Amino acid sequence: MQLMDTAKPHENTTKKIEYWWQTPVLNRRAWTWEDARNVKHQGEWWQNAVIYQISPQSFKDSDGNGVGDLNGIIEQLDYIASLGVDAIWLCPIYESPMEDFGYDITDMRDIDPLFGSLEDFKRLLAVAHSMGLKVMLDQVWSHTSDKHPWFLESRQNKNNPKADWYIWADPKPDGSPPNNWLSAFMGHSAWQWGPERKQFYMYNFLESQPDLNWHNPDVVDAILERAKFWLELGIDGFRIDAPNFFMHDAQLRDNPVRPEDAPLPDGVAPDNPVVRQLFKYNFCRRETLDALKPIRELMNQYPGTVGLGEVTFCEDSIALASEFVAGDERLHMAYHSGLLVDEPISAKLMRQMMEKVLSNFTQGGDCWIVGNHDYGRLRSRWTGKDAQGNPYPEKFYHMIATLLLSLPGAICLYQGDELGLTEARIPEDIPVEDIKDPFGQALYPAIKGRDGSRTPIPWQGDAPHAGFTTAEEPWLPVPESHYQRAVNLQNKDPNSLLNTWRRLLHWRKKQPALEAGNLELLDTEEPIFAFIRQYAEQRILCIFNLSNESARYDLSGYPGCEETKGLGFTTNRQGNTIEIPGYSVFFCNMPLSCDYQLKSN
């Protein structure tokens, strides 16, 4: 669970702060991406999977109440399968007061009636599996709802069986909170008074989301018992929400003030008051690595399942995420906020990103993500202008899809990004009084919240509410601009962004070098970003023009290079020089007999 209105650029030239995760805890041998892919080719599906993220409230409403549900997802599973993805990840569907879209849970083992029933979920699981789709569930283990039976018992007094299941602390002598920690959501004190116990309880997000005490082994056992319930049903894995928030400093020491010249944490809106502090004691703790061990031990009992951790909202998320997957006693995969940035996207940024990922994820486990339910829409974050001041053309987003699907590792694709949906605007598309996100409600207008990336999927361009619901009003409105990007309209257009994603996803499955190969970065100059992917008998040269102006690349060092056709991009080759139009791509297959010479272009 994160809370981004906008994210900072990846590169930061201000004062460097050192954190424990920037010095690897484990000794790591020299390693290549091919090592990790060998695991996949021995039967692990997740190493290079494309995972389609579904926000159930906004996907498809089947019963006319204005909110998406499980049966609505079942109705559209054939659409998801047609994309060529490998798995679906469902955001929380458990019993909840819905104060934070289901990330405030009261029962981790049952379905909220808003979405359907446990029988509906079992049917979804069966239908998805029949279509070759894996199913992953969101798991929220850092906190619960304040209406959860555990917390209702814990708050009564200091002596009950659940008294130490949450983080309680006495006030200071003057009655103020135990320390200076701030809520990541609200930006004020992370402590709320509990009059029954005459103590404060800690929360990192909303006051109604008290943090569980992961220092208590009984809490861990209870969480794993609930995880086992879903594994026994036959699900294929978990997306684990905010695992870097699991552990806190048991001494409750104050966080230091962030120096004015210190960089901001990755993916955190600069207007969020929480950035006034360094995240040293309240989360991102070293002891979290030990907390991952029992999770992995449980999942090892269910071969073929995967644990995918969300590691954002921290300083240097790439380095920290890599620690969460190092060795065989932690998570299988983790995603970071490396590409959850605002523009500009450039060859320099991409090279820096890849160099950092390759040097940190030395044992695999990287998962790429460019958008989700907590961040602004990809198309609205990367809305830059070319040299003439014109907005990025449509072809830019086709190029970005190709780039993402060419990188090593797994990929998360957020619903609607394949359609090129833009961020819903506040107040133009969503009136201020209709903001649903508590983060936006608390901090608007400095931060508009996350509603803009959670509006309903447009299924039909000529239907009320774009075919999402038959209700008079959906839970969030469908922006007017989204109707023209509806699924039924893009299905008919072979050159649509939707069909580009489909074409690329199905093509990628047939390319061992892209699915399983190592990656060699090439030394290029703006605006060219290029690399070579190789696995077994296949070697592919991948060249991207990250500008709207034509660019040339010298192919004389790559004899026998044959251009890959059918990807939807045009280039002009004259001898050993390839001219790549703006925001276009050149792929070529290189014979293994080619003794290529890396040269600066």
Question: Could you describe each region identified by the protein language model?
Answer:
Residues 96-100, 143-150, 246-249, 315-319, ...:
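Short catalytic/ligand-binding loop motif for oxyanion handling, primarily in non-cytosolic enzymes
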Residues 2-228, 232, 245-315, 457:
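Acidic/aromatic-lined carbohydrate-recognition and catalytic surfaces
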Residues 88, 238-240:
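Hydrophobic residues within beta-strands of alpha/beta enzymes
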Residues 574-601:
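C-terminal beta-strand-rich structural cap/linker in extracellular carbohydrate-active enzymes
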Residues 16-21, 25-31, 45-47, 251, ...:
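Loop/helix patches that line or flank the sugar-binding groove of alpha-linked glycan CAZymes
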